[in-house]
From Swiss-Prot:
GO terms for cellular component: nucleolus; nucleoplasm; nucleus; small-subunit processome. InterPro entries: P-loop_NTPase, UTP25, UTP25_C, UTP25_NTPase-like. The keyword Repressor does not apply. GO terms for molecular function: rRNA binding; U3 snoRNA binding. It holds the Pfam family Utp25_C. DEAD-box RNA helicase-like protein required for pre-18S rRNA processing, specifically at sites A0, A1, and A2. Present with 172 molecules/cell in log phase SD medium. This is U3 small nucleolar RNA-associated protein 25. Gene3D superfamilies: P-loop containing nucleotide triphosphate hydrolases. Residues 15-31 have a biased composition (Basic residues). Interacts with snoRNA U3. Interacts with MPP10, NOP19, RRP9, UTP8 and UTP18. Component of the ribosomal small subunit (SSU) processome composed of at least 40 protein subunits and snoRNA U3. It comes from Saccharomyces cerevisiae (strain ATCC 204508 / S288c) (Baker's yeast).
């Protein structure tokens, strides 16, 4: 839908031209009543109740002429209904896919709650806290939304990526690319480059098929000084002296694609150091975006006061511009604390409440692996949504979602709002205008419920169902035309790139600026096998997928397992007991368990993430005693508990673990049993079945070069020792 056609339709519904701009602006209460005693409006009452503490703050919105508020609201509702009718007729909403709810889609918060969850507030309190974030849309209407001094207003330099990405793209180009995505006539042109001897990157940009386009590397000088930062951020973060080099090696890799608004999928090395460094950078980027957005609106407010007939498109349907998704309250605390420290704002409302609910100094047992201690330290509650609003004087935590600039949430917390069982409580309008999305620690989120992440993407950048006081005269056309996904930047940070991570960045992101991701080259000495330290037979068996059908891959794997591996267990020339079968996916686990119950006479037990503590203890004990010959063990249980399974003599990996640390931890079960004299390493075996689709996991276990050979060579069985 073109700019002119939409505006003509909107004007026809209003019944006038240009004058509607003045009428659609927010209404501001007069500072004093006339002596005649004018009646108090509903807005006055709401402000008196909710904002007695904010009387000293001045609204940033322009004051309109005095007129009846109820009539004005009625006009605005009619305009909005008319606009929705137009939009829905031109952009019919696709039918939602029905999701099958089975055990595999349950939230994993229930796993290991007794060991790791440290929650001072019950689930009911947490749910009420989240629901309160949707109430009281007018709670902060009197706040001054200015983020700093007037001197720090943007210069609107066309070289600023904020300007070129959001404000300078021709409407015809956006329409053409949007239609190309709808008709699947888009291809990605890519360039590759080296970051170091052991790391490379690939940058790909969407191009309409049949058109020529030059795709260049995003790298400039790998310097923060190449970008237009707000002055208050430079002062707060010591970035005034260009002679200094404040960026780390990791930040130099990310600064160019990040500040150019490219989508990012970044695989990092160190839990502690790397996470702190990339959060430093994206916190700065997020703040810069928020400040520029709010200052642009303030600047245009002043322009409209001087000349009401001018047109300034600078807003979305709702205020929230940044969504940050993290796995636990501990990570949320670290992210929010980082944003506060870099903001240059001293006053933080409800900071004490936030620290009480999110901060926790408790640590997991020191006997657990270091990665476990990092992931499960502090407050591991995974049910929360918090809004952050930036005003001239303060950062307001726990702000109403529709009045927030940044929303920090867990997948489970926001899922409760988006897919609430009570349809009256479902809302997603506050996600309609998200321009930056960050997914932090995706590798941890994958063990919670990755489907929640895909649900979030389903609800991003949609036309809202309600008005939410939007000023339609200032909404950008690409919002109205449902093209906001072409402008949204998505940044995903993970310890290990997985098929799910690739699916998100490749399948759910349409950023016209393109996508950037790195690739680690893993030498054999740094692989899991190279670091295991055990001289034990490790056999990798490949099964082929006929027709290269990804959808049918689980069926081919199951068929291979039941026709090759199970008979091998029954007729084993090695140990007949102490066999641990490690299964990453819960649906595969259910399938194998049912098969072994119904089709075999093998004496086996199982432990999984939904087992009771009594079942876990009993089956582990029976397996150690040899009374159970085979034990089925799920990866999610291992992630949440990191059990030391005793009595293991041989291991079968139904699929390579996504986390290479898990491979070594499970193999060492055999080593510890051998140390006790209960097994012989010359007889014990480790067997891993894989397909060429397991390449990402495989290269972390055997190394990049070996993984290429294992995946593509004619030989199907490889052995390491």
């Amino acid at each position: 839908m073109s700019d002119s056609s939409v505006r003509e339709k909107n004007d026809n519904f209003r019944g006038y031209r240009k004058r509607g701009r003045q009428e659609l602006r927010k209404i501001k209460r007069s500072s004093a009543r006339t002596e005649g005693g004018s009646t108090e409006t509903l807005e006055d009452v709401a402000e008196d109740i909710d904002h007695r503490s904010d009387e000293d703050e001045v609204s940033d919105v322009d004051s309109g002429d005095d007129f009846d508020i109820e009539d004005e609201e009625g006009k605005k509702e009619k305009v909005y209904d008319a606009l929705l009718t137009i939009l829905k007729s031109e952009h019919p909403e696709p039918k939602r896919r029905r999701r099958e709810a089975d055990e595999s889609n349950k939230a994993p918060a229930e796993v290991g709650e007794d060991e790791h969850e440290n929650t001072e507030h019950g689930p009911v309190d947490d749910q009420l806290e989240i629901e309160n974030g949707l109430l009281g849309n007018h709670e902060d209407d009197n706040d001054d939304d200015s983020s700093g001094d007037e001197k720090d207003i943007d210069s609107e330099d066309e070289q600023d990526p904020f300007e070129s990405h959001f404000n300078q793209v021709p409407e015809k180009f956006v329409d053409k690319l949007s239609n190309a995505f709808k008709t699947k006539s888009v291809k990605y042109k890519s360039v590759k480059g080296s970051l170091s001897d052991s790391e490379s990157y690939i940058y790909a940009k969407p191009v309409v098929i049949g058109e020529e386009a030059l795709v260049e590397s995003p790298y400039r000088s790998s310097s923060i000084y190449s970008y237009f930062l707000k002055q208050r951020l430079k002062v707060q973060n010591g970035l005034l002296d260009k002679k200094t080099d404040p960026l780390t090696a990791l930040q130099k890799k990310l600064v160019d694609p990040m500040f150019q608004y490219k989508d990012i999928l970044y695989e990092y090395d160190s839990y502690e150091k790397d996470e702190d460094e990339y959060r430093d950078l994206y916190a700065l980027h997020v703040l810069n975006h928020i400040y520029k957005t709010r200052d642009r609106i303030l600047k245009n407010n002043q322009r409209l006061q001087d000349n009401p007939d001018t047109e300034h498109l600078d807003q979305g349907f709702t205020r929230p511009k940044v969504l940050i998704v993290v796995p636990t309250r501990e990570v949320a605390y670290r992210v929010v604390d980082k944003i506060i420290s870099k903001s240059g704002i001293d006053q933080v409302d409800k900071k004490g409440k936030f620290y009480d609910q999110f901060r926790d100094d408790s640590l997991p047992p020191k006997s657990k692996p270091k990665s476990f201690q990092h992931i499960f330290r502090g407050n591991t509650n995974d049910f929360f949504v918090v809004g952050l609003k930036f005003t001239r004087k303060a950062i307001k935590l726990y702000s109403n979602f529709y009045q927030s600039d940044i929303i920090v949430c867990s997948p489970l917390g926001i899922q409760m709002i988006l897919e609430n069982t009570d349809k009256k409580k479902r809302q997603d309008d506050f996600l309609s205008s998200i321009e930056l999305m960050v997914i932090d620690q995706l590798h941890s989120i994958e063990y919670q419920n990755i489907s929640h992440i895909f649900t979030i993407f389903d609800h991003l950048n949609k036309i809202p169902d309600q008005q939410h006081e939007a000023d339609f005269s200032r909404i950008r056309m690409w919002y109205i035309n449902e093209q906001a996904k072409l402008f949204r930047q998505t940044m995903v940070f993970t310890k290990y790139i997985s098929p799910a991570a690739n699916s998100l960045i490749n399948g759910r992101c349409r950023n016209m600026a393109g996508r950037w991701k790195n690739h680690k080259v893993i030498g054999s000495e740094n692989s899991s096998i190279g670091q295991s330290g055990l001289k034990i037979r490790q056999i990798f068996q490949r099964f082929d997928i006929i027709g290269n059908s990804i959808i049918e891959e689980p069926d081919y794997r199951f068929k291979f397992f039941t026709s090759v591996i199970i008979p091998g267990i029954v007729k084993s020339t090695g140990y007949e007991d102490g066999i641990l079968i490690y299964i990453p996916d819960y649906t595969d686990f259910i399938r194998i368990r049912n098969y072994m119950k119904e089709k075999t006479t093998i004496l086996f037990g199982d432990i999984n993430e939904y087992s009771s503590q009594r079942q876990l203890n009993a089956n582990r004990s029976l397996f150690q005693q040899g009374r159970l010959k085979v034990m089925l063990y799920t990866e999610r249980l291992h992630h949440y508990r990191r059990y030391e399974i005793k009595g293991v003599k041989s291991v079968v990996f139904y699929k390579p673990p996504n986390n290479p640390e898990f491979y070594n931890e499970v193999v060492r079960f055999i080593g510890k049993n051998a140390f006790l004299g209960n097994t012989d390493l010359n007889i014990s075996t480790v067997r891993c079945i894989y397909s060429k689709l397991d390449g990402l996991s495989l290269e972390r276990i055997v190394g990049t070069k070996r993984a290429a050979v294992l995946s593509h060579a004619q030989k199907e069985i490889y052995e390491f020792k």
